[in-house]
Amino acid sequence: DQITASIDDGYRMSTSLLVLDMIMNGGVRSGWVTSLGLEASGKSSLAIKMMGSLAKQHIPSYFIDAEGALDTEYACAIAGISDITEYFGRKSPTGKGYELPPKIRYTDENILEKVFRFIKRILLNLPDKVYRQDTGKWYLKFTRDKSDTEMMKALGLKHDAKLYTQTGQYWCEVPHGKFQAAFIIDSLPALVTSEVGEESDKESKAIALDARAFAKEVKPVRGLLRRK
């Protein structure tokens, strides 16, 4: 097999915590990563530290505050910034666009289906990231669709003519397997399915509905995350 998208060869992003980077073999890899821990064990603090690392590396990122409990003063102290707008941006007084563009997009959406479909929609608009063993290089692979070619030009990427002849697709060499987008959900247990309503007054039924919806929505997203 001349082509592989093995995550072991890919880029790993620092968590900004040396010990955790060592435990995770260099940092966060592409794909699905879950931080488990008891209540008040530091999961949200880790998420805030991760935001700082993402912002510094200019990786398009999204913070999904499903709990709706982000303490902006605490977040600034952890991240070492003076104002949370340094991350989330500041909207224009007119309400149109941003006065200060966001480095990280913020939403407090907590409906499970909406969150995963939002993530899926963004990932589907990104080209596949592929490591080729025959060349020993990373590539972003674009189709010949108009939207793909426009994105390729906007990013200033040039395709490999030889690979285009072989495959009929645009293979654009990139320095490493750095992931193209990151999503921080704080937290998964705070997401609720749209089916859980007043009629689901029994806790056991609500848990079952959440589990079923999660299993359905997460599969396509996990696959896309590893490819992007």
What residue spans do the PLM features occupy?
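Glycine- and charge-rich intrinsically disordered segments
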Residues: 135-138, 142-159
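Active-site glycine- and acidic-residue-rich loops that bind
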Residues: 113, 117, 163-165, 212
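Intrinsically disordered, low-complexity acidic Ser/Thr-rich regulatory segments
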Residues: 151-180
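The Walker A/P-loop phosphate-binding site
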Residues: 1-99, 103-105, 114-137, 141
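Conserved P-loop NTPase nucleotide-binding/switch module
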Residues: 181-219
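Substrate-engagement module of ASCE P-loop NTPases
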Residues: 56, 171-172, 205-228
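Loop/turn-to-beta-strand initiation segments
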Residues: 59-60, 178-182, 227-228
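A short beta-strand-to-loop transition that corresponds to the Sensor-1 phosphate-sensing loop
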Residues: 65-67, 186-188, 225-228
